[in-house]
Amino acid sequence: MQIVNISAYKFVTLEDIETLRPVMRERCDAAGLKGTILLAPEGINMFLAGTREQIDEFMAWLHADARFADIAPKESLSENQPFKRMLVRAKKEIITMKMPLIRPEAGRAPSVRPVDLKRWLDQGHDDDGRPVVMLDTRNAFEVAVGTFDKAVEYGIDKFSEFPPAVAENKAEFEGKTIVSFCTGGIRCEKAAIHMQEVGIDHVYQLEGGILKYFEEVGGSHYNGDCFVFDYRTALNPNLEPAGPVQCFACRAVVTPEEQQHPKYVVGKSCPHCVDTATQAAA
């Protein structure tokens, strides 16, 4: 049976989370879906999986709410259900930055479509002649799986480390067009809004993130695969599961080459953690 995997988010003011949460959980359970929905005062973020009929049933219900009517989820297919349970959680932020909350009523950050970004990268500048800087807003272990050519990345371990990293490097963005990007769009949108708020000009988010870029223009100007937070671990530019897997013990990304290493034991250890695991067992 083919499973439809969807991810979607929207920055929108939610003042009824206490009542919305149980209703949303009930609808997901009734549709037979599994996954996670995060609700916060600044919006919604969701990762769901089910049959085509189940997904369509839930999205029809969600779109009936004017606040969510324009949510357009990104889809991929799998042979198995990637989630074990259904969770609907109330959070302070839908993606944790530990900065003042996004003000949805102030509008979205400017975005650039994948096809336009590819054109900018092909020609070496944006439509106004400014150099384009690709800014990776993801964590270091995600970046290691793949990223855009010559992308700037700060080696962060969590998204809350992004604002101070930007503050330290703000001067480097002067006179350039900055395109923030992430897996599916949520982090790069919040990052772009933050950069605008601290006075950085000419900031865009990559519309739909890396996965939308893969879907619309393929892997041009991109090296490697895209890490995803489910059992597939990484997707190639054809949106197919790639070779890397995650180590069950330490959660590090293990490349196909590293999987051939004698220290890689499925479910127990990998070259990144085997020495630590051995010491702990001693």
From Swiss-Prot:
Rhodanese domain location: 128-222
Oxidoreductase as UniProt keyword: yes
GO molecular-function terms, A-Z: oxidoreductase activity, acting on paired donors, with incorporation or reduction of molecular oxygen
Keyword field contains tRNA processing: yes
First-level EC class: oxidoreductase
UniProt KW keywords: Oxidoreductase, tRNA processing
Reaction equation(s) it catalyzes: uridine(34) in tRNA + AH2 + O2 = 5-hydroxyuridine(34) in tRNA + A + H2O
Active-site positions on this chain: 182 (cysteine persulfide intermediate)
GO biological process, one term: tRNA modification
E.C. number: 1.14.-.-
SUPFAM superfamilies linked: Rhodanese/Cell cycle control phosphatase
PROSITE patterns (alphabetical): RHODANESE_3
Matches recorded under Pfam families: Rhodanese, UPF0176_N
Family membership: Belongs to the TrhO family.
NCBIfam families for the chain: PRK05320.1
Its job: Catalyzes oxygen-dependent 5-hydroxyuridine (ho5U) modification at position 34 in tRNAs.
The protein's name in its UniProt record: tRNA uridine(34) hydroxylase
Species in which this protein is naturally found: Cupriavidus metallidurans (strain ATCC 43123 / DSM 2839 / NBRC 102507 / CH34)
Protein encoded by which gene: trhO
